[in-house]
Regions:
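Glycine- and hydrophobic-rich flexible loops that cap the catalytic core of alpha/beta enzyme folds
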Residues: 1-170
Length: 170
């Protein structure tokens, strides 16, 4: 039997994006973050860069029988972090987010360097590049990338396995 501590974990972004497989289910809205949300996230990272740790919010998941983690809340942030890691071309990064029953989005996320990709991903990558690089040296950008992976944390909460997901948000 799991205790409350087993359901709530604090993870670095590196741990979040390199350990488990996340599934974005069909009931989640499409990825929709635009320039405003992305610029705010990246500006928050630049502002927090000199802190020991920075908490970026939460992710709520349901663990499926096969071990995959179904994202209940936080998919916009998770997808944006995946896009940022792709942009950074981190050597340790392996894509671990999939879109269930959305082949166009899933295929695009699988190969973000291909063409064409959905405009929402293309625009997000442009925004990431713009706000990551604006008035920054290469050393500053590399330092922020390291900070993001090792010092930025997210609280991941797993709902109990007997949770009725149809009634979770009621």
């Amino acid at each position: 039997m799991k205790t409350n501590n087993d359901y709530v974990k604090t993870l670095t972004i590196n741990e979040l994006l390199n350990k488990d497989k996340y599934i974005i289910p069909i009931y989640q809205r499409n990825y929709a973050w635009g320039d405003d949300e992305i610029s705010l996230l990246i500006q928050d990272l630049w502002n927090a860069k000199n802190k020991n740790n920075y908490y970026i919010g939460s992710l709520v998941i349901y663990k499926r029988g096969n071990g995959d983690l179904e994202v209940i809340d936080g998919q916009q942030r998770l997808t944006t972090l995946t896009l940022i890691m792709h942009y950074l071309k981190s050597e340790t990064f392996v894509r671990n987010v999939s879109f269930e029953h959305r082949n166009d989005s899933d295929d695009a996320l699988e190969d973000l360097d291909s063409d064409p990709i959905p405009d929402v991903f293309k625009n997000a990558l442009k925004s990431i590049k713009k706000y990551w690089e604006t008035d920054r040296t290469k050393e500053e950008r590399m330092s922020l990338a390291e900070f993001l992976q090792e010092n930025v944390k997210i609280i991941r909460t797993e709902v109990p396995e007997d949770t009725d997901l149809n009634h979770y948000f009621e």
